[in-house]
Amino acid sequence: NFHRFIGNTDVMNYADELGLLYFEEPGGFRLDVRQPFMNAVLHEKVIRMVKRDRSHPCLVIYNMMNESGNAAPEKLELEIQAMKDMRVLDPSRLILRTSAWAKGDDIEDQAKIHIRPYDEKVYWSGWYDYHRAGGPAVWNEGLYKGPDDYYNDTKNKREIVFFGEEGALSSPPRLEKNKEDLEKYSYKGWDGREFLR
């Protein structure tokens, strides 16, 4: 999973050889209708990503943004147009508007907007993704109570259910080491500032 950044071609080359599958995001794809220059740069970035990576068999999904909420109609129109432009360049991949925060089963929702492989239609349902990155971290017996009662069970039979960030944290972070490293730099970045709070 190339999460929040464009994938590394060396990694994709190895993934192609090993038969691994990847999900790629351009990173930073946050359009703003008041910023046409920024929108043009972001559009160019995502188009270049598709042109560069469309020949990699390991790549199965393009995702525009990580965990984006609902967009105003003008912004949503720009996002969907970028997805359509990607489709023209690569008809073979699933293209998602965003990952996570589907609001319910089998309902239309901006979090579910996608374009399917070899299809030009923009769908507002049929793809369900909800993140629980913290998850249980490791398996424990309490997660399975029976064939109809277990962790990640879904009754959603009409959509593809994808838990994109599921139990992503399997060990405690090295917080003291992170703090030491971040304090060496004057600019901490958005996430560095969060880590030091």
Model-derived regions: residue spans:
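Substrate-binding/catalytic cleft of secreted carbohydrate-active enzymes
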Residues: 2-197
